[in-house]
Each structure stands twice: as C-alpha cells, then as structure tokens.
C-alpha cells in the first residue's frame, strides 16, 4: 500500500513556513525564536527553563536567544518574585512593542499560508495539527546508538 509520507510533508511545510516567517520578521529585526520567547515571556512570569520547554528550544539555543534579546534591549533576566533562586525573562517596553508588531506579522504569514483552505477546513487542520504535536511531543523509545568501531 502506498501512502503519503506524512513526515516528509510536515517537514517541507514546516521548513517553508519557517523560512517565510523568518523573512517577514526581518522587517522588525526579530527571528522566529526571538518572537516565540518574547510572546511566552509576556504571557506570565516564566523562567528561562520554562520558556525553553514551551518553545521546544535546547538550553544552548535558549541562552543565545535571550542574550540577543538582552543586547537589543528587548528583554532582561531578573530574579523571580516567587523563587529567589530562579531568574525570569522580563520583556521591556521596547520588547513588548516589538513582540506585538511581530505577532501581527506571524498572524499575517499564517493567514497567507492557510489562505487556500476554507475557514472550517483551516480550523480542523489547526486542531488536528495541535493534537498531532501533542501526541508526538514524547518521542517514545529512542534508537540504540552503537559506538563506532575504530
């Protein structure tokens, strides 16, 4: 039985959408990662670790992204109001304005990407994609990595 390569289709669509989004966000001097971090930090007080988990970013990428946001004056690392040991990512006023403009761009790019779908089909697609993302978030058993022979 021949079926569509779901992994390939998702990868191609994701890659194309990410490229479109990156190009569009250049207009406000943001990357998709920066936009994602700013939006999650604006939602509520969150630590760098919490935001990294929400954004599916590894530790090194998260640190680098927050460093960039700090250099641009868009966010700051601050002590948490609820846990003195933790540092939160606080968005500056400049960062809030950039994130709002960035979100308008994100919404426009998403609308353009899904524009060929009817409203009910679009809603069903986004719902199904969200469910799929939740299902595959836990990758399950990982392949065994064998040591290379020398």
Where are these regions (language model features)?
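N-terminal positioning helix adjacent to the helix-turn-helix/winged-helix DNA-binding module
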Residues: 2, 6, 17, 33-34, ...
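Short, locally clustered residues in the helix-turn-helix/winged-helix DNA-binding domain
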Residues: 11-14, 39-43, 103, 130
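N-terminal helix-turn-helix DNA-binding core of bacterial DNA-binding proteins
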Residues: 15, 19-61, 141-144, 150
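Charged, amphipathic alpha-helical coiled-coil/dimerization segments
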Residues: 18, 67-130, 134
